[in-house]
């Protein structure tokens, strides 16, 4: 009987757990390590912030889902992974050995600017939602679709919102919605420090806020960077087309924490879900000593971007659209995703 440890409960591992609930893997003893018994679905986070959903409507009960698939749920945070000794050590000091490990632990907000500890990082989502109280003046550092969605959601709740972006990585449609909803959008204006107050520093300018939210790009978890697994230049686990580590074949990785060596693609929930479908197939094959199936990511992914109110933008390659009907479409997709784990 093989010992399999699933580290983290991101999109890919949720797909794995759902598959195991439908068809358990009887010739393996499986454990899932996660700091939270319930996982907030990232696609519905802006809707929670805007007041359209209760948090409970956007959570997956991973402890119950694991139990249905005969997977042991182990609450805790990973402190160290030793892929040479095949052990996982938790912050509690507990050790667990494995024959196979799969990592889908997501990423952190990448912020190296001075004073970042005075800000509220958007990840992990569970801690972000528990700590956030929407005050009068909010600064959001880091654009991209995630930063824009959070800005418009918080603005919808009545706050004065300033969105700082070092580069213009969002579409003209999204920019128009930011302007329309009176978000103070400042592209090409990198934040150089966050001082007590908190004060946001951009060049020689200083502006005071009640809360600063960090929604900058993805950064790897420290224990993953220090694990000895081969990583890409940004510190994410390098995997081959079967989602196995290129340096340690007993380790799989998926979602934000992984980078495909030959076919790198953007880090988003859409790709992570596809990873999950390939991952469970290859975990079953690996336990059965069968050949693994290669995974090929799609060239383009659909992005559905909410705009605070019940209004959203759809983007897929060169095609885009917007309106209340896009929000309704996204709402149906998101609710169906949550229901699939009940």
PLM features per residue range, with description:
Residues 2-72, 149-173:
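Beta1-alpha1 glycine-rich phosphate/pyrophosphate-binding loop at the start
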Residues 1-10, 136-144:
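Beta1/beta-strand and adjacent pyrophosphate-binding region of the FAD-binding site
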Residues 3-5, 68-137, 213:
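FAD-binding core/adjacent interface of flavoenzyme oxidoreductases
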Residues 257-308:
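A conserved FAD-binding loop/helix module that cradles the flavin
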Residues 127-164:
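Rossmann-like NAD(P)H-binding beta-loop-alpha module
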Residues 117-136, 198, 206-274, 281:
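FAD-site-proximal beta/loop scaffold in flavoenzymes
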Residues 309-342:
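C-terminal auxiliary extensions adjacent to catalytic cores
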Residues 72-81, 88, 96, 157-241:
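A Rossmann-like FAD-binding core segment of flavoenzymes
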